[in-house]
Amino acid sequence: MLNKLKRAALGAHTPHDKATAASKPVPMPLPAQVRILMSQHIGAPAKALVKKGDEVFVGTKIGEAGGFVSANIHSSVSGTVAAVEPFRLSNGRMCDSVVIKTDGKQTVDPAVKAPEVTDKASFLAAVRESGLVGLGGAGFPTDVKLQPKDPVDTLLINASECEVWLTSDTQEMLNCADDIVRGIEAVLKYTGIPKCVIGIENNKPECIDLLCQKTKDKPAIEVKPLPSVYGTGAELILIEKCPGREVPHGGLPAAAGAIVMNVTSVSSLGKYLATGMPVVSRVITVDGDACEKPQNLIVPVGTSYEDVLNTAGLKGGVTLGKVVAGGARMGPAVRDLSYPTTKTTSGLIMLSEATAQPPQVNPCIRCGRCVEYCPMGLEPVEVNQAYAARDVQELGKLHVDYCFNCGSCTFVCPAKRPCTQMMGLAKAFYLGEIKKGGNK
């Protein structure tokens, strides 16, 4: 199906704007408090294990996975629990959060130690205990991902980092290559997957060279340069380009014999196996045309966006128009700067008022550029018409559910139409109707 769709799929050659690619991560000043969400992942929220007044340390488990598809949560700071209270997530739902007043000491919990791993069962138990989730943005629990129902012969490491401005994965590769290799080798050894492919866009030659050097005597691990075209990092496209396979419609990567892990995720796994320290902080790229000091910061999980942005600073004479969490193309706009960072926060993009101003929208001229540059080979113009008519059957024929909202159609549209937003609405409508069983 995917190959049929990609008859004209090119992907857009967008400006990379990787100004921080050489910015080695530095720790930000410790905030006065953090708010750690019990839902930082796909699946059931974790259940808080602490109460107001409890003393916690760096690495203390403060949330227990709330089901099979869930993840443990750990404290990113040492200090005292100030509150355990509901907090509204960016999607409008409520979940518990743990507010911790920091003591400035960053004392590590004595219980933090490297896990004893001897076989597959103990390996999966260690991964679950670590609370590791996909750090590329989706947040799917890693221990669940490593237990597929289908046979898998390829571990695929997504190191493409095609999003505009983001360079946190790049810095992870440059500074933590040994951790990446350690994590990969552990997955291969304990799951029985015979080989691994690391997919890296060819605009990161230093990363390619370093990982090639680190894996030159490891025949099970291949480093594969990829074209630096926007959308390469999407799972379906990555699987097509690396193992050269097609994921069945509606299927998971394992249905094509692959498991996909983000490069920072597998690096974090390598670190946990060596030290026992879970993901309590992460590298976040802070950039954008309104940012005074673009840089990569090491940020404790739960730090407010405001504290992170204050570290980077607002450019003089510039009015902040919008902040985007994640990449500028796919990340959501931030409504409240008090919102806390999570395990999956890879970047905060500061846009000036001029840049954030919506463009003048003009009528569609049917130039076909949205079709030409869609990495999935979809037809946004036709989808728009089908959605306007609420034609579920036609939306299905147009495969609207393949859209992953990369933003390419909006980027290349000369009429400045909000194609991506329309595709997102159409996809949500279609999936909702299919779930209800309507107009098939």
PLM feature spans:
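Short, well-structured beta-strand-loop connectors
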Residues: 51-64, 83
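N-terminal, Lys/Arg-enriched amphipathic/low-complexity engagement segments
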Residues: 1-49, 99
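Flanking helices and flexible, charged tails adjoining ferredoxin-like Fe-S electron-transfer domains
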Residues: 103-123, 128-136, 164-167, 244, ...
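Acidic low-complexity segments
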Residues: 83, 88-145, 149-150, 205
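Hydrophobic alpha-helical positions that pack around
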Residues: 193-305, 311-316, 327
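Ferredoxin-type iron-sulfur electron-transfer modules in oxidoreductases and energy-metabolism complexes
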Residues: 345-361, 371, 375-440
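Conserved hydrophobic positions within beta-strands
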Residues: 79-81
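Gly-rich Lys/Arg/Thr-decorated short loops/hinges at beta-loop-alpha junctions or inter-strand turns
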Residues: 134, 155-169, 290
